[in-house]
Amino acid sequence: MDYAKESLRLHEQWQGKIEVTATVPVATKDDLSLAYTPGVAQPCLEIQKDVSKSYTLTRRHNLCAVITDGSAVLGLGDIGPEAGMPVMEGKCVLFKAFGGVDAFPLCIKSKDVDEFVNTVYLISGSFGGINLEDIAAPRCFEIERKLKEKCDIPVFHDDQHGTAVITLAGLTNALKVVGKQKETVKVVTSGAGAAAVAIVKLLLAAGYRHITMCDRRGAIYKGRENLNRIKEEMAEVTNPERRAGSLADMLVDDDVFIGVSAPGMVTKEMVQTMARDAVIFTCANPTPEIFPDEAKAGSAKVVCTGRSDYPNQINNVLAFPGIFRGAFDVRASDINEPMKMAAAQALADLISPEELSADYIIPAAFDPRVGPAVAEAVARAARESGVARI
């Protein structure tokens, strides 16, 4: 199937993938008086006295804003907020289908960090959570940080944290396949953008100790010239040996490669220099850093991609619906590191030891167990970490 051509035809037919529907009837005068004036005044007064009642007297408890500035949409780049709308609508469909979360797309026409943050903050009282989407780095880091400081509801940049959760889940099971331990494996990442930074931070939080990040200039290390603020921060907590050199140099004798960068960054010959039973996450889309057949020809044991036509797809739909479902179920004020790690462990645990293999380390997107398992684990972690409010 020509997905581009057929999708365009269907989008013209659909004229939008979501709609607002009423949950109550308005068929009689009494219906009208209860749903709207004069009866609606009473819940308004109750919320005025206690703002937390906005969660029980309105749909706020289940409503997520999916927000972009259109600056980093898929692999298309800075195409503008209006052009990002089909993706935001699609994300809202996935929230509902896989997590039962009502989501609403908002495309903001500003690339000024403070203007964007203030706009989102001013409307945050309508929502139970905020999902940031397709915002270019490094601006996305500052936007998320400032919103988390200002808002009392969860703020989650899925391009960062959803990808990180799935990667941690996959790597947890990949290491079982190859018989290696997180405390001793050496990990190299290609890319230093939003996804790579979040992946590395979550791996560090989970107990991985030997991680080296690479950008276009090679290894990132403390003291390297011309690092931006985010890379300087990452240099403080990665590459403790201050290894310098190219991506190819860093891969020699290392156990794990995680690519969230660009097509063709890795060759079969580079994989051959890695440690025995190498694990490869090659997640650039639609063309990966190295195709699975090439990686396996280079003796990789486990290979993951961002594509649905190969085994072990790194697909964020496994994470964000269940994460928000769990956060909403306990009215969490934040989505923190313990909640993300709990989501990753729940995903990894769905694959039994009997099922686990090099080609099956991550559950399928349509596995009906995924959403409930992630939601339950996230809700439990929210309670244990003190951010649950019910």
Located regions from the model:
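N-terminal ligand-binding/catalytic initiation module
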Residues: 1-155, 375, 381, 385-389
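Solvent-exposed alpha-helices and their adjacent loops that cap or buttress functional pockets
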Residues: 12, 55-60, 96-97, 122-124, ...
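Short, ordered loop/turn segments at secondary-structure junctions
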Residues: 69-71, 79, 108-109, 134-137, ...
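Glycine-rich phosphate/diphosphate-binding loop of Rossmann-like nucleotide-binding domains
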Residues: 74, 79-99, 157, 161, ...
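General beta-strand structural signal in soluble alpha/beta enzymes
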Residues: 105, 131-134, 155-158, 189, ...
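Adenosine-phosphate binding glycine-rich loop
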Residues: 158-159, 178, 282-390
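Rossmann-like adenosine-cofactor binding region
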Residues: 232-301, 307-309
